[in-house]
């Protein structure tokens, strides 16, 4: 009987289950969207129970579509939207509040207080992160401070915290396993990425009891088995990585200096810096790429908050396209952007600016500006933001990138990928298997149970689907990019109630 690896890819807008065979090919896939809650401006929430229900739904769907039995699954890998914070009752398993999503900005004032106390450098030295509402630490504090009875229960050891990986494993094991991996822990702003442990000083500063926290383990090992009553069989859960780190692993960026960019709701570029963490001087994050076989690989990361979400905005709010795929058609209907720039700073700007008070703007409009110009400028904004990050990355690492590996939904947009290559001046490579995030989690799980023999075997499985090479003249590239920099300045520091 053939064996497979099940990958759970729990994202910001949907839950997905992908089943891979030994060649790393997708055998079956299922996806289900779930609700986004926006209780106040700048607030973004998910219902953890809906995340769980959709996850179980897509697993059943993927198994049925592939005609695969539970007994044919060798291991389960989990990859997840990072930073998103769930706190639940240890006895009942019931969340005390909706999950606070990574995009949520409600804790900006808590972050401002940390900065006023002069803690920015301390936090950066310990965690590799900026002080920002993006990360889990201040979200945990907010829930404990604002949900009635939560702090008392936490102090009594009756609550549990987890990022989404932790929540799903808790549920899959019927409350037996409370665990996360290095990559997810490295996104909480309370985990010391050098000592590889929760940081007591930061927990004290944010008033977070340590009894809340999961055990932190490598990204590839058996954490426990699924509960037979919950899952239908006892199957090892053997791989965990935050979505961007999983994509890095799935793109087999195992060598120092290799980089990938994932085009999803946001855009995330990671460069493997090997076993040596590089502290950024240019607005990037130092993060853990993966931990495997007793070693930890670090990465520099540029987190861009809004890329694919800007395309959703064109579709859902402005209603000027019917689907994301339409953007390529409209973008090619005009010869250039017509001087129009869209800065999609809907929730502020991430790397390398870290401006929580920036807001979205469209500049350069004239009477001749058309729908096609706005669509094209929105796509171009994704490529410009990626260049912002790459310039910072090259400055920090001293490594000149030759090729960027790409994945995610928008990586299938050929117009965008060609423009990306043009504006960076480097080659852009798209793999045959675009499901690199899920593939990375599958690889981590498969390695832990001996389904694959080692990373060398995985290197041989990576295959290129398309190569985009720069075709734009240098002066044109720099002229367009200079326009983008001017547009960003217009968007910055827009919100005044600081």
UniProtKB/Swiss-Prot annotation:
ADP binds at residues 12, 16, 265, 308, 409, 413. CDD domains: ASKHA_NBD_FGGY_GK. It catalyses: glycerol + ATP = sn-glycerol 3-phosphate + ADP + H(+). Pfam families: FGGY_C (PF02782), FGGY_N (PF00370). GO terms for molecular function: ATP binding; glycerol kinase activity. GO terms for biological process: glycerol catabolic process; glycerol metabolic process; glycerol-3-phosphate metabolic process. Keywords: ATP-binding, Glycerol metabolism, Kinase, Nucleotide-binding, Transferase. GO terms for cellular component: cytosol. Inhibited by fructose 1,6-bisphosphate (FBP). Its EC number is 2.7.1.30. Sn-glycerol 3-phosphate binds at residues 12, 82-83, 134, 243. It is an enzyme of class 2 (transferase). PROSITE patterns: FGGY_KINASES_1, FGGY_KINASES_2. Key enzyme in the regulation of glycerol uptake and metabolism. Catalyzes the phosphorylation of glycerol to yield sn-glycerol 3-phosphate. Belongs to the FGGY kinase family. This is Glycerol kinase. It comes from Petrotoga mobilis (strain DSM 10674 / SJ95). The lineage of its organism: Bacteria, Thermotogati, Thermotogota, Thermotogae, Petrotogales.
């Amino acid at each position: 009987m053939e064996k497979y690896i099940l990958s759970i890819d729990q994202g910001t807008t949907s839950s997905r289950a992908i089943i891979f065979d030994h060649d790393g090919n997708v055998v079956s896939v299922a996806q289900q969207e779930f609700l986004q809650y926006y209780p106040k401006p700048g607030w973004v929430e998910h219902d953890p129970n809906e995340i769980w229900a959709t996850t179980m739904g897509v697993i059943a769907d993927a198994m049925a579509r592939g005609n695969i039995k539970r007994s044919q699954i060798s291991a389960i890998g989990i990859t997840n939207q990072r930073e998103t914070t769930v706190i639940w009752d240890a006895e009942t398993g019931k969340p005390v509040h909706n999950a606070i999503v990574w995009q949520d900005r409600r804790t900006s004032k808590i972050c401002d207080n940390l900065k006023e106390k002069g803690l920015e450098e301390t936090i950066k030295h310990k965690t590799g992160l900026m002080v920002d509402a993006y990360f889990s630490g201040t979200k945990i504090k907010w829930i404990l401070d604002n949900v009635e009875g939560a702090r008392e229960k936490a102090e009594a050891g009756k609550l549990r915290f987890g990022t989404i990986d932790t929540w799903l494993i808790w549920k899959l094991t019927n409350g037996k396993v409370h665990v996360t991996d290095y990559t997810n822990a490295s996104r909480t702003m309370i985990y010391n990425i050098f000592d590889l442990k929760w940081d007591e000083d930061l927990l004290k500063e944010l008033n977070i009891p340590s009894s809340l926290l999961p055990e932190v383990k490598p990204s590839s090992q058996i954490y426990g088995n699924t509960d037979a009553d919950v899952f239908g069989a006892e199957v090892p859960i053997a791989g965990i990585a935050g979505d961007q780190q999983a994509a890095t692993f799935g793109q087999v960026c195992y060598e120092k200096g290799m980089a990938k960019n994932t085009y999803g709701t946001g855009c995330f570029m990671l460069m493997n810096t090997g076993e040596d963490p590089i502290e950024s001087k240019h607005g990037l994050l130092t993060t853990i790429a993966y931990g495997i076989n007793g070693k930890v690989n670090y990465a520099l990361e540029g987190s861009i908050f809004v890329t694919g979400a800007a395309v959703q905005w064109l579709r859902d709010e402005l209603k000027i396209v019917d689907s994301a795929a339409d953007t390529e058609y409209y973008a090619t209907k005009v010869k250039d952007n017509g001087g129009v720039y869209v800065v999609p700073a809907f929730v502020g700007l991430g790397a390398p600016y870290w401006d929580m008070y920036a807001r979205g703007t469209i500049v350069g409009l004239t009477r001749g500006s058309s729908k096609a110009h706005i669509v094209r400028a929105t796509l171009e904004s994704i490529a410009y933001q990626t260049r912002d990050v790459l310039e910072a990355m090259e400055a920090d690492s001293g490594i000149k990138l030759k090729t960027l590996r790409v994945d995610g939904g928008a990586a299938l947009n050929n117009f965008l990928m060609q423009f990306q290559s043009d504006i960076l001046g480097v080659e852009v490579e798209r793999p045959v298997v675009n499901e690199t995030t899920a593939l990375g989690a599958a690889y981590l799980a498969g390695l832990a149970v001996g389904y694959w023999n080692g990373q060398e075997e995985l290197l041989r499985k990576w295959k290129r689907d398309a190569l985009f090479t720069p075709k734009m003249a240098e002066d044109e590239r720099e002229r367009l990019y200079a326009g983008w920099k001017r547009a960003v300045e217009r968007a910055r520091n827009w919100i005044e109630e600081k």
